[in-house]
Amino acid sequence: MVTMKDLLECGVHFGHQTRRWNPKMKPFIFGVRKNIHIIDLQKTLRYFRYTYNIVRDAAKEGKTILFVGTKKQAKNAIEEYAKKCGMPYVNSRWLGGTLTNFNTIKKSIRKLEIIEEMEKTGQMDLLTKKEALMLRRKKEKLENFLGGIRDMKGLPDMLFIIDAVREHIAVKEGNKLGIPIVAPLDTNCDPDLIDYPIPGNDDAIRSIQLFCKEMAEAIIEGKELREQELEGEEQEEAAPATEEEKKELIEEAVAEGEAEETEEEEK
C-alpha cells in the first residue's frame, strides 16, 4: 500500500497556481510555495488508503471499475494498469453518452466486431478497394474510441478518473447514473462531485502512474480474495465424505430409528 515516501517522490503534493484553485479544496491544502498550492499529504495518505480498501472490496464483490483518463500524461498509464488488473478503460476522447446512452455505444462495438469478422472470413477481399478502405478506417476509429470498453457488457459499477475537471462529461454521466467515482483531486477540482476523492496532483506523470498503479493493485488484491472465497465454497460443496463422517451418520440414523421404535412401543 502507498506510503508517505511514495507520495513525496512522485510529487503528489504539488497543486496548481493559487489563482487557479477551487475554494472547496481549502481543507486539503497545507500551504503555498512560490504561488503554488501545496496539498496536505497527511490527508492524502488517509484518503488514499481508505479508497484503496473501497476499490479492493468492490473488486472482491466482482464489480467492474472503468478507468478513465484521456489527456497525454494519463493515456499510457490508464491503458497499462487497466489491462494489468483486467478492467475496461477509456484513454482516447470520451464520447458523450458512453454511460448515459450505453445502448448506442454497444451498437458501435457491434460494428467493430462485424468488420473484424469480415476481415477474418475474407469477405473484406470481395469488396471494392474504396469500400475496404472506408471500412478499415472506420475500424481504426472505433478501436481508438471503444477498444478499451469493447468487452464491457453493461454499465460499470465504479469509475476511476484521472483529472475530474478535464473529464467533466464522464463525471457528470457517472453522477447522473449514481455510479460511484474515485479520483485524485487537484487544487482546481470540486470535491462535491467525487464520491471517493484522493487529494493530489493529477497532472504530473509520476503522480498519475502512482494513482493508477495503486488502484490496479487494489483491484488485483480484491480479485484474488474473491477467487479464494469461491475456491473455498467449491471445496466445501465438492468435498467427499470421510469414512468417519459416514460412520457417524450411520450411528446417528440407527440411534434415531431405535428411539422412534421405542416411542411406538410405549404408545
From Swiss-Prot:
Record keywords: Ribonucleoprotein, Ribosomal protein
NAD recorded as keyword: no
Gene Ontology biological process terms, A to Z: translation
Cysteine disulfide partners in this protein: none
Gene that this polypeptide is encoded by: rpsB
Ranges for region Disordered: 225-267
Protein name as annotated: Small ribosomal subunit protein uS2
Superkingdom classification of source: Bacteria
Hydrolase is among the record's keywords: no
UniProt cross-references to Pfam families, sorted A to Z: Ribosomal_S2 (PF00318)
GO CC term, one of those recorded: cytosolic small ribosomal subunit
InterPro entries: Ribosomal_uS2, Ribosomal_uS2_bac/mit/plastid, Ribosomal_uS2_CS, Ribosomal_uS2_flav_dom_sf
One MF term in the entry's GO annotations: structural constituent of ribosome
Bias (Acidic residues): 251-267
Protein family per UniProt: Belongs to the universal ribosomal protein uS2 family.
